[in-house]
């Protein structure tokens, strides 16, 4: 095991100042890391209003560099984050590790407006203790929009989790389109009313329903995969099938 001094070290150096001339560099030809750089640029713009250019890495100053080094960290999902006056370097042994590194940088951005955005000089080594790190979303009992699910996945990504457990069916509703069996959604996605609170036999008397088309499911799975999140599809069988 490592002590805090092994994974987090403050450096005696001036901080890195984020500005409109800062650019984000990725390994030339690596499309996955180009997309990761685009994500980071978007996070910075959303939280600070600062526009940063995404380019192939040239090693120039005033840059945030994404570096792929298969030997950098023992864990395939680990990363090293080094902040200096000249640049910020996020080094991972995989594209996923680098993505998790930018989430740490993202969480270092101010949540309120500041005249100057700076990152203190520091070195961080971070790697997960558990291979499976997931969140569960039950849409069988309560239907959520695709927009909500994407926001949910964004939160999963922010916390360096790697699995989206998507609970798509239960007694209260069947939520995934199966073209060979259309009645699963024509009938099974709807219920005549919902239980109120925890009281037995108390219902609201309001029809309720909803389901996801196959294209919507594919879109969500792709959205998660772009953020290095595996979608674990949960269909309850043979029990909990009152909806069919």
Q: PLM features: what roles do these ranges have?
A:
Residues 60-61, 172-173, 240:
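Short secondary-structure capping/turn micro-motifs that flank functional sites
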Residues 73-236:
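Feature activates predominantly on carbohydrate-active enzymes
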Residues 1-8, 233-234, 241-244:
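Single conserved hydrophobic/aromatic residue that forms the stacking wall/gate
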Residues 1, 6-132:
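Contiguous, structured surface segment used for ligand recognition
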């Amino acid at each position: 095991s490592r002590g805090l001094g092994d994974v987090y070290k403050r450096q005696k150096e001036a901080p890195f100042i984020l500005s409109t001339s800062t650019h984000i560099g990725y390994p030339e030809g690596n499309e996955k890391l180009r997309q990761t750089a685009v994500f980071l640029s978007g996070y910075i713009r959303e939280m600070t209003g600062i526009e940063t250019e995404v380019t192939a890495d040239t090693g120039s100053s005033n840059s945030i560099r994404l570096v792929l080094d298969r030997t950098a960290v023992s864990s395939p999902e680990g990363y090293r984050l080094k902040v200096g006056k000249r640049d910020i370097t996020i080094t991972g042994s995989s594209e996923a590790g680098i993505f998790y590194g930018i989430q740490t940088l993202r969480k270092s951005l101010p949540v309120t407006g500041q005249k100057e955005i700076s990152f203190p000089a520091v070195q961080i080594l971070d790697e997960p203790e558990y291979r499976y790190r997931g969140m569960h979303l039950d849409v069988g009992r309560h239907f959520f929009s695709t927009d909500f699910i994407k926001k949910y996945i964004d939160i999963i990504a922010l916390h360096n989790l790697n699995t989206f457990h998507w609970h798509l069916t239960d007694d209260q509703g069947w939520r995934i389109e199966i073209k060979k069996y259309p009645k699963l959604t024509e009938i099974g996605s709807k219920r005549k009313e919902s239980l109120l609170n925890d009281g037995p036999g108390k219902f609201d008397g309001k029809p309720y329903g909803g389901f996801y088309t196959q294209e919507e499911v594919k879109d969500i799975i792709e959205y998660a995969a772009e953020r290095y999140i595996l979608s674990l599809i949960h269909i309850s069988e043979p029990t909990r099938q009152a909806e069919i």
